[in-house]
Amino acid sequence: MNILLANPRGFCAGVDRAISIVERALELFSPPIYVRHEVVHNRYVVQNLKERGAVFVEELDQVPDDSIVIFSAHGVSQAVRAEAKRRGLKVFDATCPLVTKVHLQVARASRKGIECILIGHAGHPEVEGTMGQYDNSAGGVHLVESPEDVAKLVVKDPDNLCFVTQTTLSMDDTADVISSLQKKYPSIEGPRKDDICYATQNRQDAVRNVAEEVELFIVVGSKNSSNSNRLRELAQKKGTQAFLVDNADDVDATWFNGVERVAVTAGASAPEVLVKQVVDAIAKMAPSVVTEVEGQLEDTVFAVPAELR
């Protein structure tokens, strides 16, 4: 069997930074260290940090007074930041800098009273944090996921609008939504550069480049990982059977019946150790040749807060 490994895959700079922040906090301060929401959406990573003393909570009222709390890579609303400040909690912010960039765009729109439309998935923590940057009742913030949502959208002033996007969306689907917005609201303003992050784009391009060369695509990532789900969907749209797996235990031997070429990638929050385990599990089913497929090189690094260096 030929196993093609897509590149780039796995951890991005924002995930690396977020995990490093939790690890350094655990090293420098006594556990428990509280983390609001899963620092990244990966079961393996979260369990590893739990075993080292991290305590994951969904709300700040679960964090005792005088504690250290870390905000996840997905970001938080202004209300959460204000609550942490009011309670005097020591905060380390693991929000991805590319998410922070979107937050600043929304906050700027709020200050100017410009209605803001966010393209994203309802219920995702990044979306909740981004919408929570807007607090001007003179304008408003709206969430859309599809061209159908755009068709139903009602705004106060069609000539005073901007849009931003969640960073981990499908590039193709997002382009369709943006096109619908621009047709309905010709004067709408968007970001100077696409808000979908470089790592999301690169991993989707890697899947796009390989999908039609294989009969099966395995994406390593957790079920609640937005960017991992988009990789699986993209492979399927290319006509390739694709599955999302948390680890090697999820790999089903029946998927490989009659398959000669399989590709493997990993979402931006999945560590390489899980990819290796999946490849090893596939290789046990049949003699295999593993090939690294060339892709976009990534050298972006985001520094951790100075206090944790």
Swiss-Prot record:
The keyword Oxidoreductase applies. It catalyses: isopentenyl diphosphate + 2 oxidized [2Fe-2S]-[ferredoxin] + H2O = (2E)-4-hydroxy-3-methylbut-2-enyl diphosphate + 2 reduced [2Fe-2S]-[ferredoxin] + 2 H(+); dimethylallyl diphosphate + 2 oxidized [2Fe-2S]-[ferredoxin] + H2O = (2E)-4-hydroxy-3-methylbut-2-enyl diphosphate + 2 reduced [2Fe-2S]-[ferredoxin] + 2 H(+). Dimethylallyl diphosphate binds at H41, H74, H124, S225, S226, N227, S269. InterPro entries: LytB/IspH. GO terms for molecular function: 4 iron, 4 sulfur cluster binding; 4-hydroxy-3-methylbut-2-enyl diphosphate reductase activity; metal ion binding. Its cofactor is [4Fe-4S] cluster. CDD domains: lytB_ispH. Its EC number is 1.17.7.4. Pathway: Isoprenoid biosynthesis; dimethylallyl diphosphate biosynthesis; dimethylallyl diphosphate from (2E)-4-hydroxy-3-methylbutenyl diphosphate: step 1/1; Isoprenoid biosynthesis; isopentenyl diphosphate biosynthesis via DXP pathway; isopentenyl diphosphate from 1-deoxy-D-xylulose 5-phosphate: step 6/6. Binds 1 [4Fe-4S] cluster per subunit. GO terms for biological process: dimethylallyl diphosphate biosynthetic process; isopentenyl diphosphate biosynthetic process, methylerythritol 4-phosphate pathway; terpenoid biosynthetic process. Isopentenyl diphosphate binds at H41, H74, H124, S225, S226, N227, S269. Keywords: 4Fe-4S, Iron, Iron-sulfur, Isoprene biosynthesis, Metal-binding, Oxidoreductase. The keyword Metal-binding applies. (2E)-4-hydroxy-3-methylbut-2-enyl diphosphate binds at H41, H74, H124, T167, S225, S226, N227, S269. HAMAP family: IspH. NCBIfam families: ispH_lytB (TIGR00216), PRK01045.1-2 (NF002188), PRK01045.1-4 (NF002190). Belongs to the IspH family. Catalyzes the conversion of 1-hydroxy-2-methyl-2-(E)-butenyl 4-diphosphate (HMBPP) into a mixture of isopentenyl diphosphate (IPP) and dimethylallyl diphosphate (DMAPP). Acts in the terminal step of the DOXP/MEP pathway for isoprenoid precursor biosynthesis. This is 4-hydroxy-3-methylbut-2-enyl diphosphate reductase. It comes from Shewanella pealeana (strain ATCC 700345 / ANG-SQ1).
